[in-house]
Amino acid sequence: MAMSLLQDWCRSLDVDAHRALLVTGIPEGLEQADVEAVLQPTLLPLGTFRLRHMKALMNEKAQAALVEFVEDVNHAAIPREIPGKDGVWRVLWKDRAQDTRVLRQMRRLLLDDGPTQAAEAGTPGEAPTPPASETQAQDSGEVTGQAGSLLGAARNPRRGRRGRRNRTRRNRLTQKGKKRSRGGRPSAPARSEAEDSSDESLGIVIEEIDQGDLSGEEDQSALYATLQAAARELVRQWAPCNSEGEEDGPREFLALVTVTDKSKKEEAEKEPAGAESIRLNTKEDKNGVPDLVALLAVRDTPDEEPVDSDTSESDSQESGDQETEELDNPEFVAIVAYTDPSDPWAREEMLKIASVIESLGWSDEKDKRDPLRQVLSVMSKDTNGTRVKVEEAGREVDAVVLRKAGDDGDLRECISTLAQPDLPPQAKKAGRGLFGGWSEHREDEGGLLELVALLAAQDMAEVMKEEKENAWEGGKYKYPKGKLGEVLALLAARENMGSNEGSEEASDEQSEEESEDTESEASEPEDRASRKPRAKRARTAPRGLTPAGAPPTASGARKTRAGGRGRGRGVTPEKKAGSRGSAQDDAAGSRKKKGSAGAGAHARAGEAKGQAPTGSKAARGKKARRGRRLPPKCR
């Protein structure tokens, strides 16, 4: 965390990280002048410095200070601790040798290292896989073999070191969250803390490859020179931007490289048609299949000395100036896979490269079954990015940039933000893969939290879709699935019973306002037609207020149910029958007003059948419930 804080402050304050120190453990409340007084006896002999920034740390009851030297400082002479007030102050800095680690922090994106059957089987006659403790204690000669495996093993299957190197690498590269043992060159004590803090951010270590590590391997030595030529040409594409001092060009980038042996290409051109397609199961043109594919991570270091120069080119580089030497030796790491399908180790590396291509959003859906086609399809696309073609050691190299680190950031930050690749407009419409950026305007958006939210939303959508299909398998409603109609129908079915009672009561209240506008005509067919709605009304209404029997006919011949209607209310069927008889002879206002008081509710219930219920029967039922109005007098 302290090293990340140092890098963040240097970036925000435009301070050279190699000339800066981070001092932690400063007591709270100490002023800047007091801090400078404590630091001067220790740091002033190293060079002129100034205190640029101080801030209290959130998780600690202490402050941190950023110190900047005017000139380059000898990091070996910087003490780790400075005696100060209320304790010891710790000092951290970024060594130039640590910058190569940025190229080794890509395994989370580049490698999906898991045991394969071919790797577990190994080669007959080889020793078993050494444990993690033995991997750490290996001498420098064994370390050379481990580092060389990341550039791809030699194609000769008779070499016994090949399987051992791959298995050793698998022990070293484990997933984040598990205790891992680092192979390769042991880190110095000055680099151990930064090694832990930065490696945990991505969970992987990828050893950088130097020419000295490949001194005994002719094939890999030539491969190193070829990949270095590709990295050098890619770096030169941004040389004009960096020369202006604006540092607009990215310092680190990820590229896909194909290497083709010119002599083998000429032999392939002389072969009869169909021979290449039988040897290699792919639909690519026989002249378009390279000998190997590499995923290359390059870091431009214009301000730094090269870690290890190529011994074969050291004589020629000594005569050139320092800038040319640094430009001709960019730092890089690579994962190499040969295209020969008969090599199980090559297929393992090809699958890893294909997984990276897919995670970056460059692969097509139709090519996912064939890893080689999936990788080669990227080279045939118009990426609108930097692309170079060079020849080195009798090999043709074609390289295209897949991912850049923007805003003077490093590749680790670029990978962490999962920025979308620079695709042309027509390619952006196509699927860019799961890890492609889903922001149209900000290419660096789309972190891990957004990715988890997207995955959760997709899973929830699938679950809801499946549950909806199962729910509608035996449904009674014939509505289009997924439409608004099916939702409304489902809600209507659930609220059917409750809405009946509410609608009946509401219709009774409205009937009083419309009673003077309706007219009732007493007839036997109308009485029979309106009998069913009233019977239903009697079943659903409260027992204490609802009549129990059916109303009689106009002639008084109907029979009532046991118990009668309107018990204790002074309303009898005879009085109602007499009221209906007088309504046919007299058109007085009292007959219309009181005889049709409850006709509105049952008129709506019989509208669907084109019938209007009589007013006297509806009025009788309503009055029996309310119990307030007296029946009309018979004349």
UniProtKB/Swiss-Prot annotation:
Query: What name has this protein been given in UniProt?
Result: Paraneoplastic antigen-like protein 8B
Write out the biased-composition intervals (Polar residues). Answer: 133-147
Q: Which InterPro entries match?
A: PNMA, PNMA_N
Region (Disordered) location: 115-202, 260-332, 492-635
Family according to the record:
Belongs to the PNMA family.
Residue spans of biased composition, Basic and acidic residues class: 261-273
Task: Mark out the compositionally biased spans (Basic residues).
Answer: 156-183, 531-540, 558-568, 619-635
Give me the stretches of Acidic residues compositional bias: 302-329, 502-524
> What organism does the record attribute this protein to?
Homo sapiens (Human)
Q: Where is the composition biased (Low complexity)?
A: 541-557
